[in-house]
Amino acid sequence: MRTPKEKNSRSRSWEDDPRPRYWWHRLPGMNFVPPVYSELTDEEWAILREWYDETDRTGVGAIGECVVPMISFLHGFMMGNRARRIVQLGTCSGYSAILIGFMLRRMNAPRGLYSLDMSAEMCAISHRWIARAGLDDFVAIVELNSTDPNGLQLAREYLGGAPELIIVDSSHEYRATLTELDLWYPALIAGGLIVLHDVSRFAADFDVTKAGGVRRAFDEWRRAHPEVETFCLNGESQTMDLPRPLYKDACGLGLIHKPGIPAGSE
């Protein structure tokens, strides 16, 4: 077993790594291990570190994780409230699916994450790592377009009820994101939360269709649904340069809260 000093040095090896994906660890004052990493067992940390090593070698196609600010938000929200029925739209190569799987296992919440991605390659990578981490009882990786209506019933059947938390980090395209919100919001349990990555002006450029990205979809959807509680962090961010606002991710974070109290059966 590692000593406390070794445990507290885990992600600090990335503080001097110049590669873009490690930007958070190079920010001023971030010379510590965030709780989402420090709470992992030695075996879990080894899995995540090996995942990083492999995806570093694989290259750009496998790199697209949400990194520390967003996963830390999800970590606190999930663990503090025992969110146990989660849908993820966009799996990429499995970073958040692995970490959410570890959280679900810690909470003893099996069949807790239903993660969709339309890329067969990304699903294969993610599924291999989920199996390697021993998370097959907690996470399902499904090759399916997140705009496919069939996903609604499939997710509900796997989770055993309506999703409590939906994470949107998929195509980054305006039209697809708007379709996702229209499709999945009605499926969300009353009192549930949708979390969207990439709602900023900076991230709008990720839309390969050049139609305004997640930011435009989120803005239009929230204007069309004034009865719904919504919030946008860093929506005006236009650069990764310093100085950064309090929420450090220039890609921004959007929140959609479905008003109401869930029925007792949920």
Regions found by a protein language model. Give the residues of each.
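A short alpha-helical cap/connector motif
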Residues: 1-167, 171-266
